[in-house]
């Protein structure tokens, strides 16, 4: 993946197989209709059970997002349980940037999981036999080899599905008639939990971590994904080979950015992203970093979050917050609340970034009982769009867990009325926020984009 891959050889055609979504669609009378005809619809997605995209909780997870002080909340998130069978869960966090970043993030949130399912079944159909079949237990060496081979096969299938679905997603964004992605894009950190197997696909600087216990039952933080930023040597080398430029501005020397060869724009603060087609010929790619991990009984939970969290909280601090939460249903919100406090303490003159958090508990259980106050803040119903919860008093956070770090080597055509209403609501909240921060003359600490590019022959805007 070291070359410039703005043009790929993958087919433009999307497979039309019918994956089982845990909805009884397999074997239905709709067999002759394409999968995308039945599923890639916002209204149909809303009706899918065990899929949440707004602040709330599910059987084994909780998710929460809060708008920052930069404008419309450009973060999106999803948890989809019973994704293809009872033991499969899909989770994702998508951080948008640029003028239409919020729309890109939501489009990817809605479309990428469907593409992943469709392509997985397309690949599986060529392999013969159902995914997830395991060799029967046996003490013989042959049985162990068969199971190992099956694990490798499953790993290969998921990797190919991740690679092809990310590629198909980026192609759809490029050709989308109503979604301008030339200077807008989004990150994606996505995971599939299938039994004890964890499959991860990541682009950009959103991150996934694992909260686990060591031999002394102390909590440790394991980073599962690499922040794919331009300062990584392999990323910088690819970008430079494609004539893109990588450097940091004088007033933020710690933030390396990607620039066009002929203009000091757009200054993208990540090396891989969906969209951002102004840079796709100059080394920015949408190929995910794929990884696989076998979970153990010591592994407790997984946290996915946008960089608005990681800019101010360490992996250990996030694990500490989740592990010490008195209610699992409130864990994601507690992480966001902690990040908000840290933004105010560390960068009082900066505009806080959007924050989005997904917490997936690996034992599959949430709280047995939930207080009335929590029920008001967290809805288990499936939501069409994310909404900002009304903020009450900040919860008291009792930290009684010591956490160590364990490092790893793995570095549509229409959105319709629903999206329009969401945008109007968010814009109203943005205006209110701007009034509250009207006296702030500080700078935004880290913008994903510095400015929009000007191309030869284009008149400068005055």
Curated annotation (Swiss-Prot):
Keyword Metal-binding: yes
Reaction catalysed by this enzyme: O-phospho-L-seryl-[protein] + H2O = L-seryl-[protein] + phosphate; O-phospho-L-threonyl-[protein] + H2O = L-threonyl-[protein] + phosphate
Keyword terms, alphabetized: Hydrolase, Magnesium, Manganese, Metal-binding, Protein phosphatase
Enzyme kind, highest EC tier: hydrolase
Cofactor notes: Binds 2 magnesium or manganese ions per subunit.
EC number: 3.1.3.16
Biased composition (Basic and acidic residues): 424-434
Molecular functions per Gene Ontology: metal ion binding; protein serine/threonine phosphatase activity
Cofactor: Mg(2+); Mn(2+)
Biological role stated in the UniProt entry: May act as negative regulator of GCN5.
Family per similarity comment: Belongs to the PP2C family.
UniProt protein name: Probable protein phosphatase 2C 1
Record organism: Arabidopsis thaliana
Lineage summary: Eukaryota, Viridiplantae, Streptophyta, Embryophyta, Tracheophyta
């Amino acid at each position: 993946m070291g070359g410039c891959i703005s043009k790929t050889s993958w087919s433009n055609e999307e497979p039309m197989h019918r994956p089982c979504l845990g909805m009884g669609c397999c074997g239905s009378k709709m067999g002759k209709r394409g999968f995308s005809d039945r599923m890639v619809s916002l209204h149909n997605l809303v009706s899918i059970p065990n899929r949440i995209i707004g602040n709330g909780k599910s059987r084994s997870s909780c998710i929460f997002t809060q708008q920052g002080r930069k404008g419309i909340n450009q973060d999106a998130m999803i948890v989809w349980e019973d994704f293809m069978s009872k033991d499969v869960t899909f989770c994702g966090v998508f951080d948008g940037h640029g003028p239409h970043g919020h729309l890109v993030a939501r489009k990817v949130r809605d479309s990428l999981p469907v593409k992943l399912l469709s392509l997985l079944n397309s690949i599986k159909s060529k392999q013969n036999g159902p995914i997830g079949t395991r060799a029967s237990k046996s003490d013989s060496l042959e049985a162990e080899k068969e199971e190992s081979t099956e694990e490798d096969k499953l790993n290969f299938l998921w990797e190919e599905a991740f690679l092809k679905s990310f590629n198909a997603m980026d192609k759809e964004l490029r050709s989308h008639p109503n979604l301008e992605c030339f200077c807008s894009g989004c990150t994606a950190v996505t995971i599939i939990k299938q039994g004890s197997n964890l499959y991860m696909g990541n682009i950009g600087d959103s991150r996934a971590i694992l909260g686990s216990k060591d031999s002394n039952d102390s909590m440790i933080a394991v980073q599962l994904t690499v922040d794919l930023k331009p300062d990584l040597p392999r990323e910088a080398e690819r970008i430079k080979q494609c004539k893109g430029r990588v450097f940091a501005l004088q007033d933020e020397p710690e933030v390396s950015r990607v620039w066009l060869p002929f203009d000091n724009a757009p200054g993208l603060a990540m090396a891989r992203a969906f969209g951002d087609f102004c840079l796709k010929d100059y080394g920015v790619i949408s190929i995910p970093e794929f990884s696989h991990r076998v979970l153990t009984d010591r592994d407790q939970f997984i946290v996915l979050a946008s960089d608005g969290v990681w800019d101010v909280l360490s992996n250990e601090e996030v694990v500490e917050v989740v592990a010490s939460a008195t209610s699992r249903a409130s864990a994601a919100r507690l992480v966001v609340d902690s990040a908000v406090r840290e933004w105010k303490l560390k960068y009082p003159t900066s505009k806080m970034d959007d924050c989005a958090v997904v917490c997936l508990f690996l034992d599959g259980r949430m709280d047995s009982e939930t207080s009335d106050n929590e029920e008001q803040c967290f809805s288990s119903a499936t939501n069409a769009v994310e909404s900002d919860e009304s903020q009450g008093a900040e919860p008291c956070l009792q930290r009684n867990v010591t956490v160590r770090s364990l490092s790893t080597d793995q570095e549509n055509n229409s959105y319709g009325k629903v999206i329009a209403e969401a945008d109007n609501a968010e814009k109203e909240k943005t205006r209110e926020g701007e009034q509250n921060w009207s006296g702030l003359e500080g700078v935004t600490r880290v913008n994903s984009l510095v400015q929009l590019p000007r191309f030869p022959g284009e008149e400068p805007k005055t």
